[in-house]
Amino acid sequence: MKVLWAALLVALLAGCWADVEPEPQLERELEPEAPWQASQPWEQALGRFRDYLRWVQTLSDQVQEEVLNTQVTQELTVLMEETMKEVKAYREELEEQLGPMASETQARVAKELQAAQARLGSDMEDVRNRLAQYRSEVQAMLGQSAEELRARLASHLRKLRKRLLRDAEDLHKRLAVYRAGVREGAERSVSSIRERFWPLVEQARARNANVAAVAAQPLRERAEALGQQLRGRLDEVREQVEEMRVKMEEQADQMRQQAEAFQARLKSWFEPLVQDMQRQWAGLVEKLQAAVGTSPTTAPVEKQ
């Protein structure tokens, strides 16, 4: 999931290049936004990326034109290709982790992962095509309609910030659904086992009642024979119930361990990628600042 978070960041960049109508006037004062609640590493990375986009939008006109002419686009494309490799590796690892689960659950999760990977690959291919198209438009518009170019850039950045926040909240909900699904699956397994062996308990109670009625007869020998039969039946049922209780406990413990391992795997996948993205984005910021030169505009302070 960690890698999918990073892939989501890259895939969302495709939306920032969508065609928009040019605004009549560039808004120099950005609209206020709700504060970003960052408690997890990936949330902090999203917050820094979001603030970075706002900072780029506040740059001067000359600096914006220089930014559009840097090699940021090429480096972003390399980052996309690396992310796709990580997504593929993570998907294979996740499918191995889901091996012990039910076949229909494994098939459903694998299908969702394949669909997500296909959508991500399509989005990244669209990003490359749109980047080439937009770069050509920038070169054609330089010196002709700078105000329109700045307005389009500002609109792209605003749309990207909103998409980041919306998709981050959506992914929060999806994680909650998966966690709820794990708990629901465990409860269904326990309920299924209980339904299978509850009739045995009822049968034992019925036999006990019948034997008790027959034992009231004056024939002692018949009562003893029936008593022995009852004890044998009860011992058999007791052993079956005890065996199933042990199996239920083992299965519940196994499912808890799988859930914990799954969460640990998500954390171990995501944290290194967040650090790698932070380093790469830090490199991009340094290049942007190098292009800015002595510009008075400064980048926003990184959230701790």
Swiss-Prot record:
Q: Where is this region: Homooligomerization?
A: 253-304
Q: Where are the sequence repeats?
A: 78-99, 100-121, 122-143, 144-165, 166-187, 188-208, 209-220, 221-242
What name appears for this protein in its UniProt entry? Apolipoprotein E
Which residues lie within the region annotated Lipid-binding and lipoprotein association?
208-277
Organism of origin: Acinonyx jubatus
Q: Give the matching PANTHER family.
A: APOLIPOPROTEIN (PTHR18976), APOLIPOPROTEIN E (PTHR18976:SF2)
* Keywords of the record: Chylomicron, Endosome, Extracellular matrix, HDL, Heparin-binding, Lipid transport, Lipid-binding, Phosphoprotein, Repeat, Secreted, Signal, Transport, VLDL
Q: What are the record's GO terms for cellular component?
A: chylomicron; extracellular exosome; high-density lipoprotein particle; low-density lipoprotein particle; multivesicular body, internal vesicle; very-low-density lipoprotein particle
Q: Which Gene Ontology molecular function entries are recorded, alphabetically?
A: cholesterol transfer activity; heparin binding; phosphatidylcholine-sterol O-acyltransferase activator activity; phospholipid binding
- Which range is the signal sequence, renumbered to this chain? 1-18
Concerning InterPro entries, the annotation shows:
ApoA_E, Apolipoprotein_A1/A4/E
List residues binding heparin. Answer: L160, R161, K162, R163, A216, Q217, P218, L219, R220, E221, R222, A223
Modifications made to the protein after synthesis: APOE exists as multiple glycosylated and sialylated glycoforms within cells and in plasma. The extent of glycosylation and sialylation are tissue and context specific. Glycated in plasma VLDL.
| One GO-annotated biological process of the protein | lipoprotein metabolic process
Compartments in which it is found:
Secreted; Secreted, Extracellular space; Secreted, Extracellular space, Extracellular matrix; Extracellular vesicle
Q: What does this protein do?
A: APOE is an apolipoprotein, a protein associating with lipid particles, that mainly functions in lipoprotein-mediated lipid transport between organs via the plasma and interstitial fluids. APOE is a core component of plasma lipoproteins and is involved in their production, conversion and clearance. Apolipoproteins are amphipathic molecules that interact both with lipids of the lipoprotein particle core and the aqueous environment of the plasma.
- Region 8 X 22 AA approximate tandem repeats: start-end pairs: 78-242
Instruction: Give the record's family classification.
Output: Belongs to the apolipoprotein A1/A4/E family.
Region annotation (Specificity for association with VLDL) maps to 265-277
Tell me the Pfam families matching this sequence.
Apolipoprotein
Q: How does it assemble?
A: Homotetramer. May interact with ABCA1; functionally associated with ABCA1 in the biogenesis of HDLs. May interact with APP/A4 amyloid-beta peptide; the interaction is extremely stable in vitro but its physiological significance is unclear. May interact with MAPT. May interact with MAP2. In the cerebrospinal fluid, interacts with secreted SORL1. Interacts with PMEL; this allows the loading of PMEL luminal fragment on ILVs to induce fibril nucleation.
Query: Does Transmembrane helix appear among the keywords?
Result: no
Record's keyword annotation contains Transmembrane helix: no
Give the residue ranges for region: LDL and other lipoprotein receptors binding.
Answer: 156-166
